[in-house]
A protein has these predicted regions:
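Sec-dependent signal peptide recognition
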Residues: 1-7
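C-terminal motif of bacterial Sec signal peptides marking the signal peptidase cleavage site
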Residues: 12-15
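N-terminal Sec/ER secretory leader and immediately downstream segment
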Residues: 17-110
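Mature extracytoplasmic/lumenal regions of exported proteins
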Residues: 91-158
Length: 158
């Protein structure tokens, strides 16, 4: 009887609306982190659209490229964002390309690849978190400070 009950509990939990079996191996913090990861990726996508609408000449540096194409490039790489056109730079290195006077490529793409890869690194390149996963507070703090500096640079650089 006890074995039958153990076998049926996951079945009943899975039949509950919105509950996924994988959530059995997630803490409350993991669920909150998953929501934050999803939200930051959505925000970066919105930023891509906004920056390309304000700077269409950057998108035009790659003939035939569209905003949707750039978004697809960011989404197809689930973990590390590495692109030849940015010489495989990530994080702050890619973001600094966007502000470098000698860089002739797509500055918007460099900026969002840098931002996106930095945020992914902060979450240990995990698209979602589970019980054994751990976040490093120092890496999260550094990425938050880098985002603050990026916002300042965007406001004060023309």
């Amino acid at each position: 009887m006890r074995l039958l009950l153990i076998a049926l509990v996951p079945l009943f939990l899975c039949s509950c609306g919105g509950y996924e079996l994988k959530n059995l191996v997630k803490s409350d913090i993991d669920l909150v982190t998953d929501q934050f990861i999803t939200k930051t990726r959505e925000d970066v996508s919105e930023l891509v659209v906004m920056l390309y609408k304000r700077n269409p000449e950057q998108l035009a540096k790659n003939p035939g490229m569209t905003i949707e194409g750039r978004l697809a490039q960011l989404k197809v790489h689930r973990y590390r964002l590495q692109f030849l056109e940015l010489e495989y730079n990530q994080g702050t290195d890619a973001m600094n390309l966007a502000f470098s006077p000698s860089f002739t490529g797509d500055r918007v793409f460099a900026l969002v690849v840098g931002l996106g890869s930095m945020l992914r690194q902060a979450y240990a390149y995990q698209p979602e978190m589970f019980l054994p996963d751990q976040l490093e507070a120092e890496v999260l703090l550094t990425s938050a400070q880098n985002v603050e500096m990026l916002v300042w640079k965007l406001k004060n650089t023309r």
